[in-house]
Design a protein with these regions (language model features):
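Extreme C-terminal disordered tails of eukaryotic proteins encode short linear targeting/docking signals used
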Residues: 1-10, 526-540
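Short, aromatic/basic amphipathic alpha-helical patches
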Residues: 223, 513-520
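The repeat-register position in solenoid repeat domains
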Residues: 210, 240, 269, 295, ...
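Leucine-rich repeat
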Residues: 186-293, 302, 316, 328, ...
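Cullin-RING E3 adaptor/co-adaptor recruitment helices
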Residues: 2-225, 232-236
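Short, solvent-exposed loop/turn at the beta-strand->alpha-helix junction
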Residues: 187-193, 213-221, 243-251, 272-277, ...
């Protein structure tokens, strides 16, 4: 028989070919050449000196220590990937192309990124040879800047939201303003069934409910029963897990075969009780549906997505953090979607280089927005495929992909020249590579996130001020603690259209920058004041 102690059970698991048994001499890893019967302790027998023996006491003998070392080494090897932190200096991309490294090292002096990098290297060398010279040349303004008053619209909306329970009707209010009011009521937890009925009365074409966690199943059913759904083009029912099981959505959509003939956009983000069964009903009732958001719908599987792709001509698909969806299973269906323009697969553990390469080859030319944040298997090879096949890309989210290196920015700069939104949060890019990208292809950027990129420093500040000054409106430099007051002031004063600057975690920033910059339009979030109030103001 086999020993049932914890060590031996683990030993048999990692070394299944070992035929160790407690009754066979010369084979047990920690009993040496003696069998258990000779040693005693398994059935109350005595040991060599007549004392009762416990087999576990032998685990501390030197005879089995080499086996313990092998076991611990195997356990450490299996668990290491969960704790690994990749470093640019030592990481090598494991790619199928044997000529990858040779291609990556080729000097392309005529390409935008390489030309910008050469300029930056000269600037760095000059700085090293002239340490006393001014890096940026920014000096704080001596003029006292007037405190900017909040927009009147924001004050009115927040006052209305504060007294939301007193709202009697939303009639006569323009639709866009009505949607803002309802969104603010949802985010401030002031929404109720009476306001919902008021909101849905009339011939509205859009429903924006960013948080339905307050509602019950009956409230949602009753609201849609009294609503005219014939002209609805957009329905947003986010965070509706509590009130949106299958039968409720089936009741709403199954009134007739084409009960939502005009519906184009449907968002059910966070509806964690929905299953694949309801997706066929949605596809039948809304034949014109082009965009669907199923993010965080944890019960949706690959079969449901394949069914949607076959029945609808989708252009936008959001399947963030859907644990039961294997993207490699739905890849053929996605490749057949010729008009796919927006894809979000953030947090999908099965997204890999092969998936991105094949999909970009099939759909890259039409792709406008791509979100692959937290897809930890992606390497620079995926970014190379994006840069080579997506010339019309407008939004790219590469947050928290710690296997990317500076070459990724080279491929983006040379291939995607018209991006308006780029999110690079918590990556390992160097200061010089980010600066080269921004100088080469940052002119069209409206929103840029460099949150928690440790190496961001003066070269990036110069590139933002020179390369992004014409369009940049939203900039996130939170936790970039190498940026000085001088660097931040240089950015803010040169980017005249900058309206939001996020500086969470930037403890190095002083009053010299806060009171010394000359941009009266910028709103600095994360340093002082009420963070929630400032974030709400930025939405208005």
């Amino acid at each position: 028989m086999r020993c049932s102690c914890s060590f031996c059970l683990a030993f048999y698991y990692f070394f299944p070919n070992c035929s160790t048994t407690v009754s066979s001499p010369f084979r047990h890893p920690h009993l040496g050449s003696r069998s258990v019967q000779e040693i005693g302790g398994m059935d109350g027998e005595t040991g060599e000196e007549g004392r009762p023996m416990d087999l576990r006491n032998w685990h501390h003998e030197r005879r089995w220590r080499p086996y313990r070392a092998d076991l611990h080494r195997e356990v450490a090897r299996l668990r290491a990937p969960a704790f690994a932190r990749y470093r640019v200096e030592v990481r090598k991309d494991e790619l199928d192309d044997p000529n990858w490294e040779a291609e990556a090292d080729e000097e392309e002096s005529t390409r935008p990124f390489s030309a910008a990098m050469a300029t930056i290297k000269k600037r760095v060398e000059w700085r090293k040879s002239n340490p006393a010279g001014a890096v940026l040349g920014w000096t704080p303004s001596s003029r006292q800047r007037l405190r900017r008053a909040p927009p009147l619209l924001h004050l009115c909306l927040m006052s209305l939201v504060k007294h939301g329970e007193e709202i009697e009707s939303l009639e006569g209010i323009p639709d866009d303003l009505k949607h803002k009011i309802v969104s603010l009521l949802c985010s401030n937890r002031k929404m109720n069934s009476r306001i919902l009925r008021t909101y849905l009365n009339g011939s509205t074409t859009e429903i924006h409910l960013t948080d339905c966690s307050w509602a019950s199943e009956d409230v949602i059913q009753d609201a849609f029963t009294s609503c005219n759904i014939d002209h609805l083009r957009l329905v947003q029912l986010d965070l509706s897990g509590r009130c949106m099981p299958d039968y409720v959505l089936q009741t709403i959509f199954a009134k007739s075969q084409y009960s939502f003939p005009s519906l184009v956009t449907l968002s059910l983000k966070g509806a964690y009780r929905l299953t694949d069964n309801v997706l066929s009903v949605v596809a039948s009732s809304a034949p014109c549906l082009k965009s669907i958001n199923l993010g965080k719908c944890s019960l949706i599987t690959s079969c449901g997505i394949i069914s949607l792709a076959e029945k609808l001509n989708l252009t936008e698909l959001y399947i963030d953090n859907c644990q039961k969806i294997d993207v490699m299973q739905i890849l053929p269906a996605l490749e057949s979607m010729e008009h796919l323009k927006v894809l979000s697969v953030a947090g999908a553990s099965t997204v890999c280089d092969t998936f991105i390469s094949r999909l970009m080859h099939a759909c890259g030319y039409n792709m406008r927005e791509l979100v692959v944040a937290d897809c930890q298997k992606l390497t620079t090879k995926s970014v190379r495929a994006i840069g080579a096949n997506c010339p019309n890309l407008r939004l790219l989210d590469l947050q928290r992909l710690n296997q990317l290196n500076d070459l990724a920015l080279k491929y983006l700069a040379n291939g995607c020249r018209s991006m308006t939104t780029l999110k690079l949060r918590q990556n390992l890019f160097s200061d010089e590579a980010i600066a080269a990208f921004l100088e080469a292809s940052g002119g069209s950027l409206i929103e840029l996130s460099l949150n928690n990129i440790a190496k961001v420093e003066h070269q990036t500040a110069i590139a933002v001020a020179h390369g992004c000054h014409s369009n940049l409106q939203n900039l996130d430099l939170s936790f970039c603690r190498r940026l000085t007051d001088e660097a931040l002031g240089f950015i803010v004063d040169n980017c005249s259209h900058l309206s939001i600057l996020k500086l969470f975690g930037c403890s190095q920033v002083t009053e010299q920058f806060v009171k010394g910059h000359s941009n009266s339009q910028v709103r600095i979030i994360g340093l002082t004041g009420s963070i929630l109030d400032e974030m709400e103001m930025s939405k208005v």
